[in-house]
Amino acid sequence: MIVKAWFTTLNFAPESWNMPKKTKFFILPLILLLAACSGAENKSESTPENSAPAVPPPANIGYTVVNIYPHDTSAFTQGLVYRNNQLYEGTGLYNESSLRRVDLKSGNVQKETDLDTSLFGEGITILHDTIYQLTWKEHVAIAYSLKDFKELKRFNWSNEGWGITNNGTDLIISDGSDKIYFVRPSDFKLLRVLSVYDNLGPMDALNELEWINGSIYANRWERDYIVKIDPESGRIIGRMEFKDALQTYAHYSPAEQARVQEDGAFLNGIAWDSTSQRLFVTGKLWPKLLEVKLNN
């Protein structure tokens, strides 16, 4: 069709050309080439100029491990919070779930309350003077007094409970999907939902959460890294690698690391000290808790 249009525009057709065959042999390819270029130009002009740009991959977040502390190897860590020079930890598993206050340097439990045996404890966060703890599949969230761990109230949460943090106003919850939920703390009313993604697409299995300097940090279930999430767009803008942390910092052999990970001993604890700008990282059943200084 393009070639025919060109012939019409030029007002001549091949059968009417009065020239030597050899000349026709060179002219016809030239016209076909010009027609092809014209078609490509038209196609380019019809392409939307406002197509979505490619999503850049997450930037590497460098860090330095500045201290290593002991951690209870029986603690199936599901949540970790640092507040007023105290470390708080939520642990999981049926018949074993608890809420604890832990001495940072020794790893000793200073105060503890056990959950009902029918509840599987999950993430924790502290907002003002209240500790909030999720449960896994029981659709129950529990509020405690920070001072004495006295239970204050229970809330219904319609999804699974995995990780929880807060931005000073709202509770922020994960449920193992690629979604993060902003929730009103007074009644657990859902305020908004954030879809999390990186350059490869949606990222699911988001677990433990921590609010750090205006961003959401999350570890991914049974993975050895932490991602930094923009709380407005949901885009993953940074990533911290903790590959083979048990070998590096707890001196496990590769076989020992593989064995304990079969029992669930994966990275799953993030706590931020906003005063000293330091991060604490541990995992389920880990023997060590790391104090980390972010490099950027």
Question: Predicted regions: what is each one?
Answer:
Residues 66-98, 114, 118-125, 283-285:
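Beta-strand-rich domains and repeat architectures in extracellular enzymes and scaffolds
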Residues 89-93, 132-138, 173-177, 218-222, ...:
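Conserved beta-strand positions in repeat-built beta-propeller and related beta-rich domains
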Residues 38-41:
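Bacterial signal peptide processing site
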Residues 103-107, 145-149, 185-188, 230-234, ...:
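Short loop/turn segments that connect beta-strands within beta-propeller blades
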Residues 73-84, 117-127, 157-168, 200-214, ...:
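Beta-rich, blade/repeat-based domains predominating
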Residues 34-36:
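C-terminal motif of bacterial Sec signal peptides marking the signal peptidase cleavage site
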Residues 52-73, 104-108, 252:
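A short helix->beta-strand "capping" segment at the edge of beta-propeller domains
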Residues 143-199:
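Hydrophobic, well-structured mid-protein blocks that either form specific transmembrane helices
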